């Protein structure tokens, strides 16, 4: 991804933000305009922007040539819709998880003047997506498919979040409920669809493709998303907080993490007892005991094996696709996440 494309992408953010804070559907005064602007700047462009930039990247690989300014603008606008959706999920997710930091700074709802106003801000972020789509894509033949796609993916993500939340209900902590199949369901719906399938699906629609004919592409991307989340689970415990931008809390939050599922699979009865007694406790001492057990079970080595096997399987699936352009899109995606440290 050239720095030129990245800077053009960031310029499109400024354009979209300006349109939204001057939206004629609402009579903004200075206070509300400033609030929205601050809220957007704090939550939307702060991450790595991988999802958004992937729309441009994927479209470029499908087209196989230089993009016109118009194509760059439209691919960027779709990329920002993905980033807006992500911001909406994260703002609300942080409230639900009672998180403290996100992308190396305090979560939005933790700011003194924000608090629970963040819940409404999340709703506003979500409502910005159809406004961007309507303004810039209404005349396109694929407009309805785009709206459907974003609605579908939002539903899948919210449903995945629900499984995640009800599996970790306080007072009903039961590790025996956790398995690889539950983990996979949460990951597939909560992360894989919006982080992996959505950006590529946007590029395919923009390129004039029918998504119904690309079920195999969806399957590969969902697999990739699963692999990505396993990496995330691993980094939550073994990654350096200053590198990943947050302090991992999966153990304290009783999350159905790949690590705990694997630990339950590999542990003997005595070790399982340690997990049952310490997993999901907020104090540093039980957390340290869980981490110690993870080291005893060599989960770092188990993860390395998983990473290598997953990579080989994904490459085989990708190379089975008839279109070289689609292969390039999928390989580009995989290249961005293979062996990542954050």
UniProtKB/Swiss-Prot annotation:
It catalyses: isopentenyl diphosphate + dimethylallyl diphosphate = (2E)-geranyl diphosphate + diphosphate; isopentenyl diphosphate + (2E)-geranyl diphosphate = (2E,6E)-farnesyl diphosphate + diphosphate. The keyword Secreted does not apply. Keywords: Cholesterol biosynthesis, Cholesterol metabolism, Cytoplasm, Isoprene biosynthesis, Lipid biosynthesis, Lipid metabolism, Magnesium, Metal-binding, Steroid biosynthesis, Steroid metabolism, Sterol biosynthesis, Sterol metabolism, Transferase. InterPro entries: FPS1-like, Isoprenoid_synthase_dom_sf, Polyprenyl_synt, Polyprenyl_synt_CS. Mg(2+) 1 binds at residues 93, 97. GO terms for molecular function: (2E,6E)-farnesyl diphosphate synthase activity; dimethylallyltranstransferase activity; metal ion binding. Its main location: cytoplasm. Belongs to the FPP/GGPP synthase family. This is Farnesyl pyrophosphate synthase 2. It comes from Parthenium argentatum (Guayule rubber plant). The gene is FPS2.
